[in-house]
Amino acid sequence: MVAFWTCRNAWFQHLPFAKRGDENAPSGPRRLRPWFLVLALGLAACSEDKSAPQQAAPLPPIPVGVIKITERPTHPQLSFVGRVEATDSVDLIARVDGFLDKRTFTEGQAVKTGDLLFVLQKDALQAALDAAQANLAKAQADADNLKLQTERARSLYKQKTVSQAMLDDRVAAEKQALAVVQQAQASLEQAQINLGYTDIRAPFSGRIGMANFSVGALVGPSSGPLATIVSQDPIYVTFPVSDKTILDLTEGGRTATDRSNVAVSLTLSNGMTYPQTGAIDFTGIKINPNTDTLMVRAQFPNPNNVLIDGQYVQVTAASKHPVEALLVPQKAIMTDQSGNYVLAVGEDNKVIQRQITQGSTFGSNVVVKSGLAVGDQVVVDGLQRIRPGQKVDPQIVDATTPAQKAMSVGN
């Protein structure tokens, strides 16, 4: 409004009738009509000049932190949920019927191979052994007698005083007696074995659990386990590996079941790292159709009995030998309807969106299988302030910053 009145006053100062005392100025409507037209045109021009919009100054490029993509030697690692399993586990079962006479261990204690654990009453089985010994002695005596009779019959047959039929009967009777001796010998051995079964010993070293029967209970093969023993050192950890992971591991000619290239470590349920490293000693031969996984087993030393049969642990399998890969921090990866993408800096420092294909994830990084190349600049800081097509001021993140350190996982 002020500009309008300033312009108006300037025009009025140049009008002839604005000067007082001009004797030659025309008077009346005839004198004013041309000058009103000039005045209107001048005011319109003044108004148009002042109302023209002013162009805004361009915004400066937004500073962002970027990393330059390079191939880095990394030790890829994968995590799985595993279960601890004893290398040996056995239920102690009485192999003969009898009353439990003794229990010689403390529940939960460590035992060694051959330690005596349970004793069954021996009386009945000892009596059976004595009877078997007597039967064997009788059978042996009968056999000896028939042997003498057979020898006498042969002598008489040579003298033609007995018939061939009688000799044959004596030979057959001797053979039957020898068979009875063998049968009695077998019965004696079985009685000795049964008597030996009354002493139940540890088949291997480990730890024994709770006793399921008290002293005096009648036990036998059908009564169930007396107790359970599990070995503890070394110990197994089994974990399933998905079909997809196996395919990822076999890319580039690698072998998914190459045990020599894998170091295995454990994280316990309290977050602590198990101090011993393990090695894969078995891989399954087929995929489980119900879970699409392959079972893998690793063996670990367990000198302090930290690992317990049935325990859940986190298994980390890492490559012993470095692998060249393009790595991007997870925080730089975003997702839309087309999949995963990153924001990169292109020509003229303008932001471009790059769709990527992810590979294995380990640490705080992701392997990029496609979509990026060596030398590309990927935005890692300031992602919330930019969009594709916007001009930015890329600032390389220094190698000592956390973002760049994330690219060196496994080195």
From Swiss-Prot:
Inducers of expression: Induced in the absence of BepD and BepE.
Matches recorded under InterPro entries: CusB_D23 (IPR032317), MFP_Efflux (IPR051160), RND_pump_MFP (IPR006143)
GO cellular component terms, A-Z: periplasmic space; plasma membrane
GO MF entries: transmembrane transporter activity
GO biological process: response to antibiotic
Protein function: May contribute to resistance to some drugs, such as deoxycholate, sodium dodecyl sulfate and nalidixic acid, in the absence of BepD and BepE.
Descriptive protein name: Efflux pump periplasmic linker BepF
Gene3D superfamilies assigned to the protein according to its UniProt record, in alphabetical order: 2.40.30.170, 2.40.420.20, 2.40.50.100, Helix hairpin bin (1.10.287.470)
Subcellular localization: Periplasm
Keyword Repeat: no
Subunit relationships: Probably part of a tripartite efflux pump, which is composed of an outer membrane efflux protein, an inner membrane protein and a protein that expands the periplasmic space. Could form a tripartite pump with BepC and BepG.
Presence of keyword Coiled coil: yes
Gene: bepF
Record keywords, A-Z: Coiled coil, Periplasm, Transport
